[in-house]
C-alpha cells in the first residue's frame, strides 16, 4: 500500500514535469498553467520527502527541516538537498507571488526539472529498500 502511494506520487511528479517542460509560457494562461505544474511537482516531491522522513522513524516537520533530516541520514547528498531547497523556495515564490516572481528564475528551473525528478526517483528507491 505504502509503495503504491510512493509510485503514484512519482507518476504525478513526472506528469507535471512533462507538462511544464512541453509548454511555453507564451501567454498569461499558459504561463499560469506552467507555473501551476512546477508548483504541483515540487509540492508532490516534498510529500515524498515527508513520507520518507516518517518511514525513517523521524518526526515530520517543515519541508526545509525534512530535507535536512534526509541529508543527516545520508539519504541524499548536499547537492541534492540544495536542489530540493531551491525548488521549494521557487514553489513558495510561485504560490505566494513573492517579489513579483522573477520569470528568469522560472526559466532556469525549467531546464533542471529532470534533476528534481531524478532526486524523487532516488527517494522512492530508498523507501523501497526500507520496506524490504
Curated annotation (Swiss-Prot):
Sorted alphabetically, which keywords does the UniProt record give?
Hydrolase, Nuclease, Nucleotide-binding, Phosphoprotein, Toxin-antitoxin system
O-di-AMP-tyrosine PTM sites in chain numbering: 98
Organism domain of life? Archaea
Key word Hydrolase present? yes
A GO cellular component annotated for this chain's UniProt record is: toxin-antitoxin complex
The record's EC number reads 3.1.-.-
Q: How is it modified after translation?
A: Modified by cognate antitoxin AF_0948; probably at least 2 successive AMPylation events occur on Tyr-98.
Pfam families linked? HepT-like (PF01934)
Query: A GO molecular function for this record?
Result: RNA nuclease activity
The record's section on InterPro entries has: HepT-like (IPR008201), HepT-like_sf (IPR037038), Type_VII_TA_RNase (IPR052379)
| Catalytic residues (UniProt) | 91, 96
List the ranges annotated as motif RX(4)HXY motif. Answer: 91-98
The record ties this protein, via Gene3D superfamilies, to: bsu32300-like
Purpose of the protein? Probable toxic component of a putative type VII toxin-antitoxin (TA) system, probably an RNase. Probably neutralized by cognate antitoxin AF_0948. Neutralization may be due to AMPylation by AF_0948.
Assembly mode: Homodimer, probably forms a complex with cognate antitoxin AF_0948.
Membership in a protein family: Belongs to the HepT RNase toxin family.
- Please state what the protein is called: Putative RNase AF_0947
Organism per entry? Archaeoglobus fulgidus (strain ATCC 49558 / DSM 4304 / JCM 9628 / NBRC 100126 / VC-16)
Amino acid at each position: 500500500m505504502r509503495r503504491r502511494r510512493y509510485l503514484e506520487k512519482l507518476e504525478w511528479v513526472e506528469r507535471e514535469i512533462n507538462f511544464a517542460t512541453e509548454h511555453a509560457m507564451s501567454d498569461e494562461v499558459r504561463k499560469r498553467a506552467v507555473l501551476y505544474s512546477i508548483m504541483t511537482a515540487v509540492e508532490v516531491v516534498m510529500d515524498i520527502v515527508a513520507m520518507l522522513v516518517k518511514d525513517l522513524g523521524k518526526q515530520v516537520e517543515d519541508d526545509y527541516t525534512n530535507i535536512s533530516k534526509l541529508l543527516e541520514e545520508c539519504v541524499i547528498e548536499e547537492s541534492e538537498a540544495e536542489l530540493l531547497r531551491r525548488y521549494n523556495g521557487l514553489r513558495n515564490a510561485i504560490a505566494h507571488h513573492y517579489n513579483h516572481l522573477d520569470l528568469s528564475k522560472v526559466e532556469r528551473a525549467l531546464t533542471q526539472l529532470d534533476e528534481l525528478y531524478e532526486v524523487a526517483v532516488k527517494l522512492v528507491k530508498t523507501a523501497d529498500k526500507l520496506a524490504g
